[in-house]
């Protein structure tokens, strides 16, 4: 299949990488797995056994007329432990390489199908100035965009750093969440070739 390139000749690309069916279930699984992997999982609360004190029973079992109580750190007491206390846990989910690659191919194919993938021969800025990058993006009518190149250009990275709706990644640093989070994905021809190598 062919991909149109801005101000250049169309390029031939792999049908497998850029022309497959959109598998929503698989993409959802990949996104959830990626985001779960970013969770810290260090939340911890104290149960009745973790809270300091509460060893001696507050009053005897019978004869006071009050409800029986064995510890002042019971979850129903003020200052007591938490009933179902959170514990540190690993939220990461396993996703096979084959499934991850298939999800990435599915996302790229959907970007092509919905005209959200903008392919350019090359994209760079001469100086690390946000103003220069903004001018270039405005000329292409791009406001909310992920820029993917073969390797991250330092000037481009510095110029985009202060723009809230612009991100710069290399092919290796691209992930399912970043690819679907932006209105458009601006990608260089060399990055397209690298995606074909990695996902083909």
From Swiss-Prot:
One GO location term (cellular component): ribosome
InterPro entries named in the record: Ribosomal_uL4, Ribosomal_uL4-like, Ribosomal_uL4_dom_sf
Stored Gene3D superfamilies: 3.40.1370.10
Comp. bias (Basic residues): 54-65
GO biological process per UniProt: translation
GO molecular function: rRNA binding; structural constituent of ribosome
Domain of life (superkingdom): Bacteria
Disulphide linkage map: none
Alphabetic keyword roster: Ribonucleoprotein, Ribosomal protein, RNA-binding, rRNA-binding
Region (Disordered): 38-68
Pfam family, any one: Ribosomal_L4
Family: Belongs to the universal ribosomal protein uL4 family.
Protein task: One of the primary rRNA binding proteins, this protein initially binds near the 5'-end of the 23S rRNA. It is important during the early stages of 50S assembly. It makes multiple contacts with different domains of the 23S rRNA in the assembled 50S subunit and ribosome.
Subunit structure as annotated in this protein's UniProt entry: Part of the 50S ribosomal subunit.
UniProt xrefs under NCBIfam families: rplD_bact
Name under which the protein is recorded: Large ribosomal subunit protein uL4
Phylogenetic placement of the source organism: Bacteria, Pseudomonadati, Pseudomonadota, Gammaproteobacteria, Pseudomonadales
């Amino acid at each position: 299949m062919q991909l149109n390139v801005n101000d250049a000749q169309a390029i031939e690309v792999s049908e497998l990488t850029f022309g497959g069916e959109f598998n929503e279930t698989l993409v959802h699984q990949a996104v959830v797995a990626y985001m779960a992997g970013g969770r810290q999982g260090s939340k911890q609360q104290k149960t009745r056994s973790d809270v300091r004190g509460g060893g001696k029973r507050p009053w005897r079992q019978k004869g006071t007329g009050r409800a029986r109580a064995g510890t002042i750190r019971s979850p129903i007491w003020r200052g007591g432990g938490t009933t179902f206390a959170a514990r540190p846990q690993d939220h990461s989910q396993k996703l096979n390489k084959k499934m991850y690659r298939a999800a990435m191919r599915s996302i790229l194919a959907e970007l092509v199908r919905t005209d959200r993938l903008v392919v350019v021969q090359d994209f760079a800025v001469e100086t690390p100035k946000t103003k220069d990058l903004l001018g270039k993006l405005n000329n292409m009518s791009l406001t909310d965009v992920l820029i993917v190149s073969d390797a991250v250009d330092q000037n481009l990275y510095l110029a985009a750093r202060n723009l809230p709706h612009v991100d710069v990644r290399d092919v290796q640093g691209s992930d399912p969440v970043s690819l679907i989070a932006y209105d458009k994905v601006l990608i260089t021809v060399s990055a397209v070739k690298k995606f074909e190598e990695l996902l083909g």
